[in-house]
């Protein structure tokens, strides 16, 4: 980490401010070659956590833009190194020009996630906290943001360390008993060992149980809006998305391609897919859309099944109800602003949740959100308590849990404590891998290659 790195840390789009971040031993020297403050003080003379207004200049003395320089001195910075942040007006061109001036002054381009990688290598964050940073950046809802913030502040890491602390006490007793059998070493208290193993199992099982729910808030649910033609699927899509995403006409078969949009409903990002009305058709183009709708239904995590209450149930409605048996689905009895002609009781018998709604007026939308909250069990999610964020974390936690269960089974079978020791040590190694205390460089590379440049 000898080289000084730099990158644009704001979004690659026009905005109020553009910012170039510089980190490394030469950060102040690089900034001094680019920045001139109105006070006459060089960046290298500024105290940590101070800012100064000035300008960015080319080597020929040409002024690029007004710039604010913000200084962080090692080790009290995000990366643990000397850091300078140069903020200019947020045009794409001027921000790129500012970065080029910094690179010409001696900095090297930062790779994806290299600032956070340096924070990890310098002990400012562990690997689980680093992964949560990407969760903060990518959060699409309140619960996902809370979970990511808890992770980046170390809540998950503290839970893992608490499990490790209990197991380390037992591991040290086991090691002393195994290494010094002829010394006056107290015998291993097996009940205490078993209690520690079971406590670790319980904590890990809770974390693993929350993984899928946490992923639901982070990644959203693949949600299909299905129904026969003219049931009001596209009108519902437009209502939920808050804009005219789908074409709406009185003619059946208007929607042919799958129209997609992500919306936040009941606190959960729903990746909506408005599909073609499912029916038998001789139109070859519409038929392709119908087949696409059926494929989407097969892989959907949630289905919003739309029925037109102003008409009697038809063949396509019955077929849809049969198709959705055992599938997480909410029945939406649509067009409640019109006289009802449908046998609503039949739908209520077929679906666990039924919502009466008018997609054209919006009446019933709150009820839909309430029913989704119940079916998705959103009240049972407590992100502030710590959540496993990635498949890597999940795999390490599962490995630790499996090892502890094997240790408990070894004790139940009356196997020697040597066998139990191996299981406890395997669990500790898996937990250390989760937080990054014992992890290969290949794993570290894989984690940070998912990051954006500038973070």
Which residues are covered by each model-predicted region?
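A glycine-rich (often HGG/GG-containing) alpha/beta subdomain
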Residues: 1-146, 150, 154, 330
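C-terminal-of-GTPase-core extension/linker across diverse P-loop GTPases
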Residues: 2-8, 12, 142-264, 281-283, ...
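Short glycine-/polar-rich loops that comprise or flank the Walker A/P-loop
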Residues: 15-17, 49-52, 299-303, 326-329, ...
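Short beta->alpha junction loops/turns
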Residues: 23-24, 91, 252, 309-310, ...
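Switch I (G2) and immediately adjacent beta-strands of P-loop GTPase domains
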Residues: 52-73, 253-281, 299-302, 306
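Glycine-rich, N-terminal phosphate-binding loop of Rossmann-like dinucleotide-binding domains
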Residues: 88-90, 240, 275, 307-310
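Conserved beta-strand segments of alpha/beta enzyme cores
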Residues: 108, 269-271, 353
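Inter-motif core of Ras-like GTPase G domains
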Residues: 286-310
């Amino acid at each position: 980490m000898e080289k000084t790195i730099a990158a644009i840390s704001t979004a690659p789009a026009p905005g109020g401010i553009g910012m170039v971040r510089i980190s490394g031993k030469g950060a102040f020297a690089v900034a001094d070659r680019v920045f001139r403050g109105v006070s006459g003080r060089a960046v290298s003379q500024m105290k940590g956590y101070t800012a100064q207004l000035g300008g960015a200049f080319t080597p020929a003395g040409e002024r690029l833009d007004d710039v604010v320089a913000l200084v962080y001195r090692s080790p009290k910075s995000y990366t643990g190194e000397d850091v300078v942040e140069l903020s200019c007006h947020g045009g794409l061109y001027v921000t790129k020009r500012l970065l080029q001036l910094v690179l010409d002054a001696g900095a090297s381009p930062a790779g994806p996630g290299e600032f956070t990688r340096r924070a990890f290598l310098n002990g400012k964050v562990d690997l689980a906290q680093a992964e949560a940073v990407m969760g903060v950046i990518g959060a699409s809802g309140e619960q996902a943001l809370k979970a990511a913030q808890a992770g980046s502040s170390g809540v998950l890491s503290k839970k893992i360390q608490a499990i490790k602390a209990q197991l380390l006490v037992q591991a040290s007793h086991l090691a002393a008993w195994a290494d010094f059998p002829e010394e006056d070493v107290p015998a291993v208290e097996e009940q205490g060992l078993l209690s520690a193993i079971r406590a670790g199992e319980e904590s890990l099982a809770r974390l693993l149980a929350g993984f899928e729910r946490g992923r639901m808030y982070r990644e959203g649910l693949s949600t299909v809006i299905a129904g026969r033609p003219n049931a009001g699927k596209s009108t519902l899509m437009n209502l939920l998305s808050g804009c005219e995403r789908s074409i709406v006409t009185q003619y059946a078969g208007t929607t042919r391609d799958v129209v997609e949009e992500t919306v936040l409903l009941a606190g959960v990002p729903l990746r909506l897919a408005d599909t073609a009305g499912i029916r038998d058709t001789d139109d070859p183009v519409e038929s392709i859309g119908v087949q696409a709708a059926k494929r989407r239904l097969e892989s959907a995590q949630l289905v919003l099944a739309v029925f037109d209450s102003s008409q009697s149930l038809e063949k396509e409605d019955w077929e849809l109800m049969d198709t959705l048996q055992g599938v997480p689905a909410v029945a939406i009895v649509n067009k409640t602003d019109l006289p009802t002609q449908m046998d609503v009781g039949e739908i209520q018998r077929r679906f666990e949740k039924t919502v009466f709604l008018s997609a054209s007026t919006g009446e019933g939308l709150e009820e839909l959100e309430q029913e989704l909250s119940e079916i998705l069990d959103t009240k049972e999610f407590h992100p502030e308590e710590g959540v496993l964020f990635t498949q890597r974390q999940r795999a390490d936690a599962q490995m630790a849990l499996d090892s502890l269960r094997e240790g408990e089974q070894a004790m139940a079978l009356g196997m020697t404590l040597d066998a139990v020791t191996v299981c406890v040590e395997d669990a500790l190694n898996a937990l250390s891998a989760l937080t990054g205390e014992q992890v290969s460089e290949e794993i570290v590379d894989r984690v940070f290659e998912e990051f954006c440049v500038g973070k």
